[in-house]
């Protein structure tokens, strides 16, 4: 066994800190007439900024979690801030764009888990979860009103006049479209037998334009909120239909009435205006706005931290500088298709390290969600592993978004089942293809759960594993969750207590043979700490090799550089230490 020398440890610390510190920006809209509203991970935390083409102006006093989506040109910004040391009990704060830093707490909104929201400048409409309900709320001159109870996770997409449109995970894993009325409240839910709705926006004609993701493709439809009738949307240009997307990640109407759409295929997106494709940098893009006569969006790739660019030139407006030595540590990336146990092909992104030999040490990095996607987008975890000399394999296991509804829904009723086989297939591919000399596994949230599943159900496949903010016991987690997460667990497990019990790693501790690092935020309210403490006791009682890091006063969401370092650094250092054990 070779011991990591202090100089190597120092390099890992320095590189991880530098990667976390790189400024990252996402575009939220246009406010104060003609200023861009940007949320940035900068100055060591998440903050809201105004950008007028020159300098940025910070709006908030203290770090935030997010902002509510603003209508074009409004003179204020609604900030979302955790006021519970990471437990995701959020409060709302208003700041006028003309008086940066002068925050006013909206006292009518008691702390709750804020899921989404839109600010019209006169009314704030948002969804929130408490222990006993998920609801749609409005805050305006009449005070705070509950417009409707929601069956599960719900997200406000748009408001036009009194019409509110949104999306929700209301049953069976599918995504429904819903509408409500700002004045009178109420809830109408629209489902499609073909698949799930994705991003939605209200047209000038007061119909809801939405993405409809079916078994293996995605298309645009309009939904009449009066009768629920659904029609395919015809666009002036055929570029969009020729692109044949599998996902629609964002859409919205520009002030001039044109429809902007961001669609994705094989982990990369394309931008369309009224169906015509707009030249954009390769990678992925966020919302699109019209600003001073030009299109602006956010852009990222596996080698490019999130930044703000104009289209079609791709000229950066706001970006963080990635140090050249760290840029070189990312030797390249590609998408491969891995055959799984049932003949399914698992779309898998591969990030090769410029600091590792081939074959070399390789980490299977498993994304959370599970309804999420690894794509050609910046990932600080993956970049840190590459800088530490690991190749990275990122499988989009069944349950992942971006590859059609058929693939996404395969996970329902089968957690720690088929998707674990997909992750295992990606690991075997890494070795058989000549990329990996030895294999490790790492994940956060549902990815941490996959680490525990792999070490309990697939002993011997990986040399060691890192489980961050992981699910340990579905039954106990259910009892500790609020209304939104209880509904999520019911949908994922099919409501089966037997599935919850049999697919919980706490019940299979005896099978763990490889070293394990546990990293968990103290105040995590999505994957609570209590089950992990029981797991630690079981590991200790059985003489298993493990280390544990509890991050004080932190929650599931990583919103400060300090929390990011406390989570990522022990993970990378643990894997680097295990790599030297022969």
From Swiss-Prot:
An example GO BP is:
proteolysis
Catalyzed chemical reaction(s): Cleavage of an N-acetyl or N-formyl amino acid from the N-terminus of a polypeptide
UniProt keyword Nucleus, yes or no: no
InterPro entries the record matches = AB_hydrolase_fold, APH-like_N, Peptidase_S9_cat
> Listed GO molecular functions?
omega peptidase activity; serine-type endopeptidase activity
Task: Indicate the secretion signal residues.
Answer: none
Tell me which domain of life the UniProt entry assigns to the organism this sequence originates from: Archaea
Query: What Gene3D superfamilies does the record tag this protein with?
Result: alpha/beta hydrolase, Peptidase/esterase 'gauge' domain
- Active site at 445, 524, 556
Q: What is its EC number?
A: 3.4.19.1
Its keywords, alphabetically, are: Cytoplasm, Hydrolase
What cellular-component terms does GO give this entry? cytoplasm
Q: What's the main place this protein lives?
A: cytoplasm
Name recorded for this polypeptide: Acylamino-acid-releasing enzyme
Please give the organism: Aeropyrum pernix (strain ATCC 700893 / DSM 11879 / JCM 9820 / NBRC 100138 / K1)
